[in-house]
Regions:
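Extended acidic/polar regulatory tracts at the flanks of large eukaryotic scaffold/adaptor proteins
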Residues: 2-67, 81, 117-204
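Elongated alpha-helical scaffolds that mediate protein-protein interactions in large eukaryotic proteins
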Residues: 40, 60, 95-106
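Structural recognition of alpha-solenoid helical scaffolds
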Residues: 47-50, 62, 66-69, 92, ...
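Extended, compositionally biased eukaryotic interaction scaffolds
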Residues: 79, 110-116
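Extended, hydrophobic/aromatic-rich amphipathic alpha-helical segments that build helical scaffolds
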Residues: 82, 86-89
Length: 204
């Protein structure tokens, strides 16, 4: 009940958020803007889960709209904004299923995801680069192997091979962090699951 109340409060708070551009953003874009605001010192779990719910409920072009907006924030100059966006991306991947997985598996998305990666790996990756490498490694070992639609996710495997060829080293993914992407896992939308997600995001 507490998690549901928090998400309802987030919906009320951000549903009328003004636009910072000339165009009026969609409800989904306003939520993503709120989730990735540089004023946030840590991920807002309630807003992140509300975004996942919006993607699932609206369907249609919502997965593509969300993936495009999120990857733009991942490339933000402010590393805190980029890390917030990566945390949001993780929530969406683990809660939105195939329609969203299909978007992150496109060549366009993956090229944008690694746009700030130099041709030669740095001696030590930045926190943002490390989180991106971790995400790609996690996707390769989970949805690219266990999803019934894994044949549609070949570009993720291709990107993993390309980065490995260039010399990038992928971190080991914690089993409990990746387990939620297994088909047999229960929903992560219970209060207990919300706490687990929040603890995971605080490690970013």
């Amino acid at each position: 009940m507490e998690a549901a109340s928090a998400r309802a409060a987030a919906r009320d708070r951000w549903s009328d958020m003004p636009s910072s551009s000339g165009r009026t953003p969609s409800q989904l874009q306003r939520f993503i803007q709120a989730a990735c605001s540089p004023e946030n010192y840590e991920p807002n779990l309630a807003v992140n889960l509300e975004i996942a719910d919006l993607i699932n409920s609206k369907k249609g072009t919502a997965p593509r709209e969300a993936a495009t907006a999120i990857v733009n924030y991942i490339n933000h100059r402010n590393p805190n904004v980029a890390l917030l966006a990566l945390g949001l991306l993780d929530i969406c991947v683990k809660n939105c299923g195939y329609p969203f997985h299909l978007q992150i598996g496109t060549k366009e998305f993956l090229n944008e995801l690694v746009r700030r990666f130099p041709e030669r790996p740095p001696m030590r990756p930045t926190r943002v680069q490390a989180k991106i490498l971790e995400a790609i490694e996690e996707w390769r070992g989970t949805i690219c192997e266990t999803s019934r639609y894994k044949e549609d996710l070949g570009f993720i495997r291709d990107m993993h091979r390309l980065l490995s060829y260039k010399g990038y080293v992928f971190p080991e993914v914690r089993r409990e962090d990746a387990a939620v992407l297994n088909p047999s896992d229960v929903s992560w939308k219970s209060p207990e699951s919300c706490v687990s997600i929040l603890n995971m995001l605080r490690r970013t």
